[in-house]
């Protein structure tokens, strides 16, 4: 049986080494708190305004945007070298468990990544190297969550278009 990390690498097309290259540089020190706040604000503004894929926006219908922004930037700060803001306020991140109530499908991961790529591209003060490292981490982590979701719903998953060397027909 493949590990969740192996599935995440296969489905995302991002190796674990590429995904965790965010640990080579303290991105929090490099970018600063305000950049992470801006990134998360930019991301959730896109999510809550998503009129192309209303099914995706509806996933967040029971969440207050301000809380979603704070949860995300605090997690990013903590994961990328800053103080443990998320854990101090919410406890261990436990990403799979925290996302369990939501439909974490290949389609949802792709839509999340679409909005995150746009947010990264339009958030000032994030250099190209940091964007690449962050996006590799986000892509791998999104599919780690999909793999975790598959454990609880093994018959609901459809392979994603990025699955390395797989025929998705």
UniProtKB/Swiss-Prot annotation:
Residues annotated for heme b binding in this entry: 99
SUPFAM superfamilies, sorted: Globin-like
Record keywords, A-Z: Heme, Iron, Metal-binding, Nodulation, Oxygen transport, Transport
GO molecular function, one term: oxygen binding
InterPro entries linked to this entry: GlbO/GLB3-like, Globin-like_sf, Globin/Proto, Hemoglobin_trunc
Any GO BP: nodulation
Gene3D superfamilies: Globins
Keyword Chaperone: no
UniProt KW Chaperone keyword: no
Subunit structure: Homodimer when ferric.
Free-text function comment from the UniProt entry: Hemoglobin-like protein that exhibits an unusual concentration-independent binding of O(2) and CO. Required for general plant development and during nodulation. May promote shoot organogenesis from root explants.
Family assignment from sequence similarity: Belongs to the truncated hemoglobin family. Group II subfamily.
Name by which UniProt lists this protein: Group 2 truncated hemoglobin 3-2
Organism lineage: Eukaryota, Viridiplantae, Streptophyta, Embryophyta, Tracheophyta
